[in-house]
């Protein structure tokens, strides 16, 4: 095996089942095994095992997560494990997204409406930039990575190399920058823009916030290249040569654009004849007006709103061909880790059908050309065709993963902490609420927390209200609560602002809370998705990070799913306790800071600034400067927007020190939001 470019930084050695699992997975990869499963119980260190495998194999890796929040958590963990390598984050960059749609029954057209998170867009560009420039790359992504992205061939083809002494006029460079969708803005200098001052051109690349490039010209030659602070103009480093990557993934050179526009006109003519032949004159007029407006903008600007709907023509694909996506940016030998595979695999399979249904209506009624159907996520078989070697990671792998891997399973049942699976108990449903209330009071008195899962939203609300009336502080989670607020509620539970969290689906992200010593499942004998054997095992795992962990199921009969879940938990528990006895291990509850992984950055920034101040007073002022104003993620987002306005105003007034302070604060607040799972 060649030397790995990854440097794993950790104070821990693999323990429990980790050494055997790591060795087995690495051996299988080296032997060419294409699919295998890592079955790891909650708290067994699956992320650490993945990192060890990546470091030993030395290949670029994609870690696929079922949602943005879990992706953010994994991103933070991998950044800490690989601080010297490229760990990047690739999720949907929309803070808000209302897709274009048409409802024929009410003749209602819903225009696309969205809000793009600039920080996430930067991270997406950083991800593709890393993949095209180095091999020591780990990309943590949500399933949005299977959606269409610009062709990597065109993206790489349109990079702009610059170096000192190069014969290149400023006008020629400006023309090329505009072609790859950079905008000139001499007043509001931000990511994806450039400005000109005399013989100096400055640009902030699409994959940077904090650094800009300064290119100085002497006549038609490049005289010097520097990296600078975009706010203060301070030179950070001299650069002999560099490469500027496009500001958009949907870029095309002029020749290709001319060909694409011609192809779009041909398709439009063909579709109009078809619609008029069917006497659908309204649809024909609508389609012609909308498409001609887009073509006019593409001819003038090189792009248009919704340009992704023409991606088939821009990429030169045939009808029905799959789009390029993030997977196409990886080299052929990459590794894929599908985290929480029992959820993620089915998500990948479902993406195409939902997208197709919505767009078919738009095409049928003249809002889009048929080629818009090819701006889509990958179909499941297309996704599989792009894989090289995959590891499916879950505490409860599904039948598909087990069949796909032909029984090649590495088990992590033993936790490095010595913690064992919780004891499970079944009690009758009669009087279940008051019985549970008593259990909650016991846990609250011991400074422990409780998770309760119900069948309906109404029951969750009623139970929460009743517990609060009876003096037990409780809150509930439901589908109306967005990701950021959800993380805030979970942090509040850990801080003991309340003791009982009630919800319908406690299988979602962010609920591995070491303070939880009791998980209660009401109406456990009502069969369904959330009461299947796999779901029950996942729910049991929420109590597996506390040495006092218990599971209470309220049911009048023991269903097949309940029995299977209890049997599997008993099997794991027996093996875990046996290992502990043999190795003289005494389990202890995990101690974990309540703060997000980014909170240490606040402390470091405050301390550094405090050293420049006057003793304790300087440190106190620094802490006030760098601490977030609010723990509410919505408020944090508003604060960031206000601070960005203040920063630009300060820079305009030449108050560079003030602007730099605001810049640092914005960066920390953005990372705080990302650590809380709210980054887009």
Curated annotation (Swiss-Prot):
Tagged with keyword Transport: no
Molecular functions (GO terms): ATP binding; ATP hydrolysis activity; DNA binding; excinuclease ABC activity; helicase activity
Motif window: Beta-hairpin: 93-116
Gene3D superfamilies: P-loop containing nucleotide triphosphate hydrolases, UVR domain
Domain (Helicase C-terminal): residue spans on this chain: 432-594
Superkingdom of origin: Bacteria
Coiled coil: none
Domain Helicase ATP-binding: 27-192
Chain residues that bind ATP: 40-47
Statement: the UniProt record of this protein carries the keyword Transmembrane helix: no
Residue ranges of every copy of the UVR domain listed in the record: 637-672
UniProt keywords, alphabetically: ATP-binding, Cytoplasm, DNA damage, DNA excision, DNA repair, Excision nuclease, Helicase, Hydrolase, Nucleotide-binding, SOS response
A GO BP annotation: SOS response
Protein's cellular compartments: Cytoplasm
GO cellular component, one term: cytoplasm
Record note on quaternary structure: Forms a heterotetramer with UvrA during the search for lesions. Interacts with UvrC in an incision complex.
Free-text function comment from the UniProt entry: The UvrABC repair system catalyzes the recognition and processing of DNA lesions. A damage recognition complex composed of 2 UvrA and 2 UvrB subunits scans DNA for abnormalities. Upon binding of the UvrA(2)B(2) complex to a putative damaged site, the DNA wraps around one UvrB monomer. DNA wrap is dependent on ATP binding by UvrB and probably causes local melting of the DNA helix, facilitating insertion of UvrB beta-hairpin between the DNA strands. Then UvrB probes one DNA strand for the presence of a lesion.
Family: Belongs to the UvrB family.
Domain notes: The beta-hairpin motif is involved in DNA binding.
NCBIfam families in the cross-refs: PRK05298.1, uvrb
Protein name: UvrABC system protein B
Organism: Nitratidesulfovibrio vulgaris (strain DSM 19637 / Miyazaki F) (Desulfovibrio vulgaris)
């Amino acid at each position: 095996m060649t030397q790995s470019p990854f440097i794993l930084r950790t104070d821990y050695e693999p323990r429990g089942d980790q050494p055997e699992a790591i060795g087995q997975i690495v051996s299988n990869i080296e032997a060419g095994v294409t699919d295998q499963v890592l079955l790891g119980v909650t708290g067994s260190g699956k992320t650490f095992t993945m990192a060890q495998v990546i470091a030993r194999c030395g290949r670029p890796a994609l870690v696929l997560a079922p949602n943005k929040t879990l992706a953010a958590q994994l991103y933070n963990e991998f950044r800490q494990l690989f601080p010297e390598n490229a760990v990047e984050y690739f999720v949907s960059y929309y803070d808000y997204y209302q897709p274009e749609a048409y409802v024929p029954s009410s003749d209602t057209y819903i225009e696309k409406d969205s809000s793009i998170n600039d920080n996430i867009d930067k991270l997406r560009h950083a991800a593709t930039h890393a993949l095209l420039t180095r091999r020591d790359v780990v990309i943590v992504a949500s399933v949005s990575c299977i959606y269409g992205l610009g062709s990597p061939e065109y993206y790489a083809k349109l990079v702009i190399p610059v170096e000192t002494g190069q014969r290149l006029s400023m006008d020629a460079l400006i023309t090329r920058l505009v072609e790859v969708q950079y905008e000139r803005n001499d007043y509001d200098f931000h990511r994806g823009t450039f400005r000109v001052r005399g013989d100096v051109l400055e640009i902030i690349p699409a994959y940077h916030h904090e650094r800009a490039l300064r290119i100085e010209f002497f006549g038609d030659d490049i005289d010097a290249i520097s990296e600078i602070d975009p706010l203060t103009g301070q030179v950070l480093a001299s650069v002999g040569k560099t490469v500027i990557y496009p500001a958009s993934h949907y870029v095309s050179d002029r020749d290709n654009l001319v060909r694409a526009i011609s192809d779009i006109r041909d398709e439009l003519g063909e579709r109009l004849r078809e619609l008029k032949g069917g006497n659908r004159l309204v649809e024909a007029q609508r389609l012609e007006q909308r498409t001609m407006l887009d073509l006019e903008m593409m001819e003038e600007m090189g792009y248009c709103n919704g340009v992704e709907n023409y991606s088939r023509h821009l990429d030169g694909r045939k009808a029905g061909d799959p789009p390029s996506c993030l997977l196409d940016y990886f080299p052929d030998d990459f590794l894929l880790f599908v985290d929480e595979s029992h959820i993620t695999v089915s998500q990948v399979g479902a993406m195409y059908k939902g997208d197709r249904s919505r767009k078919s209506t738009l095409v049928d009624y003249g809002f889009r050309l048929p080629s818009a159907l090819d701006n889509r996520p990958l179909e499941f078989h297309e996704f599989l065709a792009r894989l090289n070697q995959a590891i499916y990671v879950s505490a409860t792998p599904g039948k598909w993963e087990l069949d796909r891997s032909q029984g090649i399973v590495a088990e992590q049942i033993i936790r490095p902490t010595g913690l064992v699976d919780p004891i499970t108990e079944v009690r009758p449903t009669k009087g279940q609420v008051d019985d549970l209330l008593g259990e909650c009071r016991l846990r609250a008195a011991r400074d422990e927390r409780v998770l309760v899962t119900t069948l309906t939203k109404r029951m969750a609300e009623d139970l929460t209200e009743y517990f609060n009336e009876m003096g037990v502080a409780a809150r509930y989670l439901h589908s109306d609560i967005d990701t950021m607020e959800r993380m805030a509620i979970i942090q509040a539970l850990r801080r003991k602002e309340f003791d009982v969290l009630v919800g319908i689906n406690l299988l979602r992200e962010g609920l591995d809370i070491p303070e939880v010593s009791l998980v209660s499942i009401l109406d456990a004998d009502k069969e369904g998705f959330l009461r299947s054997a796999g779901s029950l095992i996942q729910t049991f795992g929420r109590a597996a990070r506390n040495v006092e962990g218990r599971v209470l199921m309220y049911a009048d009969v023991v269903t097949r799913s309940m029995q299977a879940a209890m049997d599997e938990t008993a099997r794991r528990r027996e093996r875990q306790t046996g290992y502990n006895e043999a190795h003289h291990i005494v389990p202890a509850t995990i101690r974990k800071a309540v703060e997000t992984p980014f909170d240490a950055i606040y402390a470091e920034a405050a301390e550094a600034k405090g050293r420049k101040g006057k003793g304790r007073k300087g440190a106190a002022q620094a802490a006030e400067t760098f601490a977030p104003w609010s723990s509410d993620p919505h408020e944090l987002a508003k604060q960031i927007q206000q601070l960005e306005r203040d920063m630009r105003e300060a820079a305009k007034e030449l108050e560079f020190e003030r602007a730099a302070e605001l810049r640092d604060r914005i960066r920390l607040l953005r990372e705080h939001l990302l650590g809380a799972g709210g980054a887009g």
